[in-house]
Amino acid sequence: MKKETQNLQCIPLVISVLSLFGVSSARKPPYLCNRVCGGISIPFPFGIGGKECYLNPWYEVVCNTTTSVPFLSRINRELVNIYLPDPTEYYSNGVVHIKGPVTSSGCSTGTSQPLTPQPLNVAGQGSPYFLTDKNLLMAVGCNVKAVMMDVKSQIIGCESSCDERNSSSQVVRNKICSGNKCCQTRIPEGQPQVIGVNIEIPENKNTTEGGCKVAFLTSNKYSSLNVTEPEEFHSDGYAVVELGWYFDTSDSRVLSPIGCMNVSDASQDGGYGSETICVCSYGYFSGFSYRSCYCNSMGYAGNPFLPGGCVDIDECKLEIGRKRCKDQSCVNKPGWFTCEPKKPGQIKPVFQGVLIGSALLLFAFGIFGLYKFIKKQRRSSRMRVFFRRNGGMLLKQQLARKEGNVEMSKIFSSNELEKATDNFNTNRVLGQGGQGTVYKGMLVDGRIVAVKRSKAMDEDKVEEFINEVVVLAQINHRNIVKLLGCCLETEVPVLVYEFVPNGDLCKRLRDECDDYIMTWEVRLHIAIEIAGALSYLHSAASFPIYHRDIKTTNILLDEKYQVKVSDFGTSRSVTIDQTHLTTQVAGTFGYVDPEYFQSSKFTDKSDVYSFGVVLVELITGKNPSSRVQSEENRGFAAHFVAAVKENRFLDIVDERIKDECNLDQVMAVAKLAKRCLNRKGKKRPNMREVSVELERIRSSSYKSEIHNDDDDDDDDDDEDDQAMELNIEETWDVGMTAPASMFNNGSPASDVEPLVPLRTW
């Protein structure tokens, strides 16, 4: 039965909504209108904009777009605030606060004539406004009498004076205005709604006596400290007035309640409960019948003048629900709530939330841990595959056979090198070339190393690569960069060398610095150390090793400016009984032995030729990578040889050393370089002979005794020699089968990559 009653109640609700808002398909619902102006909320039945936004013109609010100040258009007063009916806040009716007029006299121009503004007019056919009983008539100043106008059959007013005798009694009675400098009085209820305020001068008082005087209606409660200064009220120009508002029941659109219960009906039925959403009270004012509706304060809040405007309050989330239920379960219901005993085993919501959150957190950690484990397993599997593919097992076997050499190369793990290079951070890059990148790193023992990460390696060269690593790891010479080890757990092998801090010889020859000047003595010392290192590689190592890429960019200088021969990327070891090595041509333009270029047979004399070019660089200070232009269009080496033969030696000596050098020594080294550059490898000295000869040249007792037995032969073969030089230059791009990056006519790759081999094994 109750359910049927509720269904029947929905019918008048729908009808009232349609009648109240004049709903049609073409009209916008009032809850979609603008509801704020100047920070003031404008709830329905008030509204801004079109007719669908407010109930009728009496409720229209005009929002000044420039100042964002709201005005009640029908009474032309600035709006301060709007309150919906709320019995809990002592607003049985709706309330609006507006700015009312202030009447003044003698405040600005010095005249005693009162300045009386337009009276406050809230009357009119259908006006829902009236002055509430919270408004008072106040007069502030000395010798001022405030009188309300337009109040028929009554004289309402008050009079203030400046009698100091009343000040003590004023404080005792704790009244704001008791006649001393200000006065106040209540206004009658149920009076017409056009009310003005005038100022009169009391009898037996001078019109100019007392200074500024003001009178006004207000609902504000002022303290006794600030109410006796009339100038402040005059400067403000307004006083806040409270108006009550209601629905006129003669309006056809509000004949049916919006699903609300009448208070009188509720009294007859013994009151209303939580099932009642909103309540309407009825009354009369000055002959008018009105209705005032509000949401049931027992469990609802909102705007009762909108469909569905009164919404249920969830008391379980408020202090009232928590206090009343305490250890019981709070259950929210429409309009109210109940406290029910907890079920056996029921967990508190907070504790339950902690358990669920902890479980989810553990689950997330488990998933993350599983992901990391799988990722680690996959990475380990890949590293094992790379290790086998890159010849790791073969290298282990080779190292096992070399037990006597404790300083053999070490096999680094990928984790070690990632940690050493900060995961191969780009900020650690020392150089970058066509075949790989070199990073500066620091091992766990504090050693600074150069880590070369190659770009590619042929799979059919794995065994050869491992053999070369083992051989190079055995090199132990103070003027040769030490190969510390390698890592085979990456896609391509990573090589680890000792770090050499002071760059390469080529850069030092081009750009001398103040802290280390490349004098002739320094250059000769460097040449001797290079020759000693190459002599060691060719004859003193376990197996003869041919460097195959001797050039100034591969000659590094350590912190003491001692020579370190580097870049063994194209090096080859040979057995004792081998006299040459047949390989794919590799090298750098300007340094390659012409005989090797034609035959592809590399011998120890090929390194001698390249060293001869380095000697020419030390003497001339010029770079062989750029061609020396001459009338005969000779190459760098041929130009030097011709200058020595034609006694133009002083023309090619570096200007920076010409004045301070021992010319006998320079001439001797030049002749030695000429022998190293002989087009016939058999006529070149070996590196041991070159090393001994350079030591003799440096000796203070040395005089030029360089053997030049082959000069005549060279003279006989000048034309062939020149033709050979030209042939090399003309066929360079075709004949060389090594990568193009190795034959850079500009700055060699090693200029920026001193430790990176030009080609990976």
UniProtKB/Swiss-Prot annotation:
This protein's domain notes: The EGF-like region is specific to this family of proteins and seems to consist of the C-terminal of an EGF-like domain fused to the N-terminal of another one.
Cited SUPFAM superfamilies: Protein kinase-like (PK-like) (SSF56112)
PANTHER family assigned: WALL-ASSOCIATED RECEPTOR KINASE-LIKE 2-RELATED, WALL-ASSOCIATED RECEPTOR KINASE-LIKE 21
Organism: Arabidopsis thaliana
Enzyme class: transferase
Residue(s) carrying Phosphotyrosine: 497, 596
Lineage: Eukaryota, Viridiplantae, Streptophyta, Embryophyta, Tracheophyta
Segments passing through the bilayer: 350-370
Binding site for ATP: 430-438, 452
Domain Protein kinase: 424-697
Keyword list, A-Z: ATP-binding, Disulfide bond, Glycoprotein, Kinase, Membrane, Nucleotide-binding, Phosphoprotein, Serine/threonine-protein kinase, Signal, Transferase, Transmembrane, Transmembrane helix
UniProt GO BP: cell surface receptor signaling pathway
Entry-linked InterPro entries: EGF_Ca-bd_CS (IPR018097), Kinase-like_dom_sf (IPR011009), Prot_kinase_dom (IPR000719), Ser-Thr/Tyr_kinase_cat_dom (IPR001245), Ser/Thr_kinase_AS (IPR008271), WAK (IPR013695), WAK-like (IPR045274), WAK_GUB (IPR025287)
Cytoplasmic side: 371-761
Entry GO CC: membrane
Record PROSITE patterns: EGF_2, EGF_CA, PROTEIN_KINASE_DOM, PROTEIN_KINASE_ST
Record EC number: 2.7.11.-
Cystine connections: 280-293, 316-330, 325-339
Gene field: WAKL4
Function comment: Serine/threonine-protein kinase that may function as a signaling receptor of extracellular matrix component. Plays a role in plant mineral nutrients response.
UniProt modified residues of type Phosphothreonine: 583, 588
Name this protein carries in UniProt: Wall-associated receptor kinase-like 4
Keyword ATP-binding set for record: yes
Induction remarks: Induced by INA. Up-regulated in vascular tissues after Na(+), K(+), Cu(2+), Ni(2+) or Zn(2+) exposure.
Distribution of this protein across tissues and organs: Expressed in the whole plant. Detected in root-shoot junctions and lateral root initiation sites.
Stretches of the chain found on the membrane's Extracellular side: 27-349
Region (Disordered): 701-761
Active site annotation, chain numbering: 549 (proton acceptor)
